[in-house]
Regions:
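Gly/Ser/Thr-enriched, mixed-charge loops and adjacent short helices
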Residues: 123-233
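Short beta-strand-to-turn element immediately C-terminal to the catalytic PLP-Schiff-base lysine
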Residues: 129-132, 249-253
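N-terminal small/polar loop signature for handling phosphorylated ligands or for N-terminal nucleophile
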Residues: 63-124, 197-251
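Proline/glycine-rich low-complexity loops and linkers
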Residues: 85, 142-167, 252-276
Length: 276
């Protein structure tokens, strides 16, 4: 599909009028990811184009792929995998998994793609690109956007991959001296595959709420919700995640803590553990 940079001034004006008239939403393209309403302003051809462009950045010939729990995730995942395989990239399929798990795997094998629109509304979806365990730069984004004129490659292979995230995290965190009663608001997202088991492994007594997206009592973004159910059920500690589990809100002492406090606590703990 055409992007505004490729249009004349008159054509861009007509496009703005069309969007205003028909409430057309434009796909968001940034180093944080490609995001849009799948099937309305974000299409299969976009997925193929951006993944083709991203393949130019992959030097190891390997790419981890994970996704959150959105309804369109599996459809996009198959398209992403097929595109990578066609480009000669070996695909490590992590299935439904938190974004940090994909980042860690990408650091190990060289690249990763997360199919997510993070905390955006459920009808949205998108692609987050990772190189060597980090997000892409502005220069790399320009390469991702130019998914044309690619040489033919041998077909890559697909590997259903497990993650050592939980076992490695337990080694870093260690076991708790005193068991904690923890309530986790999954938010219907990917946290369900990691958070409960990890907390149990370090010695917590865990209760979960909103395990599935269907019937979830709140929206995708825990920072914009009062988290009333979580607050009422939390005894020692509570955690609320967004759909791809790269946002977390802490509940303690009968109330929801701000995201700034949550981040600060995480940074302090990381420094104490010597994590960089």
């Amino acid at each position: 599909m055409l992007y505004q940079a490729e249009l004349s001034r008159h054509e861009r004006f007509l496009l703005r009028v069309y969007k205003k008239r028909f409430w057309f939403k434009e796909v968001k393209i940034s180093i944080s990811g490609i995001r849009g309403v799948y099937g309305k302003d974000f299409f299969p051809e976009d997925v193929i184009k951006f993944c083709n462009g991203f393949s130019k950045l992959i030097k190891t010939g390997k790419c981890a792929i994970g996704m959150d729990t959105r309804e369109t995730g599996e459809m996009i995942q198959k398209l992403v995998s097929a595109t990578m395989l066609e480009r000669g990239i070996d695909v490590y399929n992590l299935g439904i998994t938190p974004t940090p798990v994909v980042f860690r795997k990408a650091r190990e094998i060289g690249a990763g793609i997360v199919i997510t629109s993070s905390h955006n509304p459920l009808e949205w979806n998108g692609l987050k690109f990772i190189i060597d365990g980090r997000g892409i730069t502005l220069d790399e984004l320009e390469i991702v956007k130019n998914g044309k004129n690619l040489d033919k490659k041998d077909i890559g292979k697909e590997i259903i991959s497990d993650s050592n995230y939980i076992s490695d995290a337990v080694k870093i965190i260690g076991k708790l001296n005193k068991p904690q009663q923890v309530t986790i608001d999954i938010g219907g997202g990917a946290a369900k595959t990691i958070a409960p088991k990890l907390l149990q492994e370090i010695g917590c007594q865990v209760e979960t709420i909103n395990d599935e997206l269907d019937g979830c009592s709140r929206g995708p973004d825990p920072t914009s919700n009062e988290l009333t159910e979580l607050v009422s059920k939390t005894k020692d500690l509570g955690f609320a995640f967004d759909l791809d589990s790269d946002r977390v809100i802490l509940v303690m002492n009968g109330g929801k803590k701000s995201s700034d406090i949550t981040l600060g606590l995480g940074v302090v703990k990381a420094i104490k553990l010597g994590i960089k």
